[in-house]
Amino acid sequence: MEAERGLKFILTGLFLFWSSSVQAQQGFPSFADLAEKLTPSVVNISTVHQPDENAETGENAFSSPNPAIDRFFNQKGNNQTALGSGFIISEDGYIITNNHVIDQAEEITVTLSDNGTETARLVGVDPKTDLALIKIDTKKKLTPAVLGDSDKIRVGDWVLAIGNPFGLGGSVTAGIVSAKTRDIEAGPYDNFIQTDASINQGSSGGPMFDMNGEVIGINSAIFSTTGGSMGIGFAIPVNLAKWVVEQLKNKGEVKRGWIGVKIQPNSEEIAASVGLNAQEGVLVSLSLIHISEPT
């Protein structure tokens, strides 16, 4: 009887252990099928440019006042060759990447998922959002990524980051959306998606996918005190990129509207002229409306 009880106890223990193992496995999803489907739309980008001591390129071309916020693409040699990432958005060869990846580039080479290489031409850049559009002309059948809706993502959602960290193309990492609408003081349009997916030097310009396999962000920066991933990465929302890319595709540049406004203190004369009794507030005068950048 004692031996029988002992056997039952052991079997019960094994069953409970096996059950908990199955539950643990079910709690961590496999991204293998999704990664296999998405990787062909991601490309590696290599650029060549002559060193220019007066020109700020690479990681210094678009930086935050916070020294721990890094724009992160990998440079080799004497700033002559740089590596980054990008992703195909159309069957005719348009590719989105970061402006700082191709800034000052004299040659842009794209390596596809089949390891074939193509020479790319620059279509347009928008330094204010750190976005760029390039194009390759190839007879190969390309697999474009699907652009999603970054407004629909929620903090805690799973995401995949695919890119070319340290020249290791096709690297896939997973994480969650850690926060939205982050301002890292990198530019006038800061509205970053924060993630803990591991992204490193060379990943700049690569896509961030949701679990539907749609692009919801463009990986652009990391917070790091070491130069490597510390689990705090930032991506440009794809909804912003859609508008910028459309302008770059059609015009080669982004034209923005702006308003000239003059503000002056209120006074008795001003208050009387507009029929007010109080002297509180300020007077706002609309002077100019333009549909291009102010000079």
Where in this protein do the model-derived segments appear?
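Bacterial N-terminal signal peptides that target proteins for export
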Residues: M1-I10
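Serine-dependent protease modules
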Residues: A24-L288
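Residue-level detector of conserved catalytic or cofactor/ligand-binding positions
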Residues: S287-T295
